[in-house]
Every structure is written in structure tokens, then in C-alpha cells.
Amino acid sequence: MFLSRRLIVSCLLLAAGCFAIGLWSLQSGAVPLETGQIIAALLGDAPRNITLVVTEWRLPRVLMALLIGAALGVSGAIFQSLMRNPLGSPDVMGFNTGAWSGVLVAMVLFGQHLTAIALAAMAGGIVTSLIVWLLAWRYGIETFRLIIIGIGIRAMLVAFNTWLLLQASLETALTAGLWNAGSLNGLTWAKTWPSAPLIIVMLTGAALLVRRMRLLEMGDDSACALGVSVERSRLMLMLVAVSLTAAATALAGPISFIALVAPHIARRLSGTARWGLTQSALCGALLLLAADACAQQLFMPYQLPVGVVTVSLGGIYLIVLLIQESRKK
């Protein structure tokens, strides 16, 4: 199958950007390091203190930024494909808010138990998506109705989350408040279980379903004529996208706008929707890693939650996108 040079170059540039910013993030911080020291630490040849800084403190954060960004980018690409709407994303429709509601319930009931938090995030995201799906169902799914109902459910969940925080202990409320902003601070290898493996499984599932997604983009009638079970395929894709969002939320809190922005930027860079999930994964990973680097370095020695940076940049992009859509109409 012929692939355009622009598509290949854009994917290679995104991958190179991830590598460059990842390496810079490993070097930067309160203890500046050289590239040679990074390589030695990764190979186990560096002094113990440098190895500790690189492999236990900085490397998990960099890798999780890449993985979470990829998960959000793929999730956003799936939602925009299913909705056939540039505003179709899990954060706009409230699915990451539902996952965050699950996290809050788990934190209030079980404390910071990682498995309970991951499972509760999954449950919250999936239950929210099913409620939105059922309320929007009228002999099929209409995109506009689905998005409007999702926005309404999101508003209700925000109120519920505020009430939960008021009922929680002071320590839990402070921890949840930082997490609610979306933060990669303090991520270690131990805290990646079980959410990180789940993201990898769901990314694999998304890759296996990409053919169905492309056929659905041709229209329900065409997809059905080609042997695709339309509603079943749409539900499977939505569950994969919601699971990716929920697992990312369990790791770092509800990080907004990556899922919305990454697919748009990926399509503009390559000029095509082919390899859409791959492009969106690379773009989401690059955006979140760059945002986290800014969050760490802009106000040193203080660190911002990465969600503050993504909301600031994503809000500007959303305004531009809405203006462009209104001009088209």
C-alpha cells in the first residue's frame, strides 16, 4: 500500500520530537545531567545516586507521559471518528469526569489503593459512557444528541465530585485536589500498576479494531453492506476509548484537551487520516511530554500540575477550532 511522503515524514518527526524532549526531560531538573550520564545510568554503569535519579525518579515520569499521552490521543481519535465531529472527545463528553468520579469514590472508601483506584476509574468511565449511550439512543445514535447529553452528564458529575470532596477527610481532599488538576508528579514504577499494562492492552485492542473504524467512517449503510455489525463495532470502539481514558485518569488524573487536540494536529501535519491512530498516539505523547516539561521548568523550583498547562493551551486551540467551524457554516 502506497504511503505518502508527508505522512511518513510527519510520523518520523513526531517520534523524533518525543525522543528529543524525553532525553531533555531526563537531563533537566534540580540535578542537571549530561547525555553520557543518562546512558550510563540506563546501562547500570553510573554511580548509585545518578542511577536513582534517572531510573527511579525521571524515567517513570517520562515513559508514563508518553504512554498516557498516546492513550489520550488514540481515545480522542476514536471518539472523533465515531462521532464524525471535531468536538467528539472524552473530556468534552464527560467520560474522563466519570472516571474521575470513580477515582474519588475509591479514594474516599479505600484510600490510595492503586488497584481499587484503577478499577474504580474503569467502572466510572464505562458506567458514564453507558448512561450517555442509553440516554442518547433513539433507534440509533445521533451525534449531536450524544454530545449534548454527554455535556449535561459531565456537569452533573462535576457537582457530584465537588460534594464528594466536601465529604472527604482533609488529607484525602488535598491529595484529590492535586490529582484533579492532572499531575505526573511522584509517579514511580510501583504506581504504574495496573493502569499502565491496561493501557497497553487497550492500545492493542484499538489497533485490532482500526479496520472496523475505517469502514464505519464510510457510513453506516456502507459498513453494514461490507459485513460490519455497526452498533456492536461502535460500542466496542467506545469501550476501548473509554478504557484508555479511564486508565490514564487513574494514573495522572483527568488531563484535559490532549484527546481533543492531538487528532486535529496529527491530521494537519500529515494531510490525511490514514494511520490516524498511530499519528494521534505520537502527537498525544509529544504534546503531554512537552506540556509536562513546561510544567516542570517554567516556574522552577515550583512545579505546576501538567493539567494546568494542557487546559491553558487546549482552551486557546478550542476557541480557534470553534471559530473555524462557525466560518465554514
Language-model-detected regions and their locations in the chain:
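Alpha-helical transmembrane segments in inner-membrane proteins
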Residues: M1-K329
